[in-house]
């Protein structure tokens, strides 16, 4: 990376940190209920609609992970994945009126798949591609029949990423914030990250731990989701290195991460926050780990189980 590029990245990182607070403040002022995101839907459940304030999101950053899982859950394989290298071949992900929603989501999916394929090959591991399905209203999966209310999700049983194109506009409308292309891209990269977790054996180790220690299930679920956010940030690091990510783009992704935070959604639904019920993490947590992946550009920095 050249010196001017490195300086620009430092500026972008600093502005991204400031954007985390700005995104929370803007979203806290929104009144309508927000739809949830059904990530890693092994049972077809989705996060309930809700809201929060910026201060509440910050205050509850660490409460959901009071039961600290063993660091061995992350596994040695993740540490073998190298830092994302400088790109050798640019790929266009630009969204335009002629591109179409489905085409853009498909392009992001395949770009994320290509990144993880390279990462696995560099580590001497085999990457088995995920399956992409774009749906409307409802879809039949190995995890059961899911409605559009679930939002985008990953089904471990058939290793499929399922995306409802209307989810993104609906999510933005319900909180009064327009979500741009890279907010959508963040969600897609997050779901692909769940596939990466399955291939690395992380999801299997989490499920085994859940069986042995049911009381810690929610805490481990939060860490699994935050790791997927971090992996999504690693992908965003790669898009930045290709010159396809601007400050506004990353702020857009941070805004989306805030909306799908458990505290944000709980506050909107009930007016209260109960960290013990979280399954995905607070707005501040999700923004933190997305930023960590983006700044570090290395999967090894995403050990949320050892943090």
Task: Pin down the residues of each PLM region.
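Short helix/loop segments within enzyme catalytic domains
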Residues: 106-109, 113, 118-121, 223, ...
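Catalytic zinc-binding patch centered on the HExxH motif and its immediate surroundings
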Residues: 137-164
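Short pre-active-site segment immediately N-terminal to the catalytic Zn-binding motif
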Residues: 169-186, 218-222
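Catalytic Zn2+-binding segment of zinc metalloproteases
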Residues: 192-207, 240
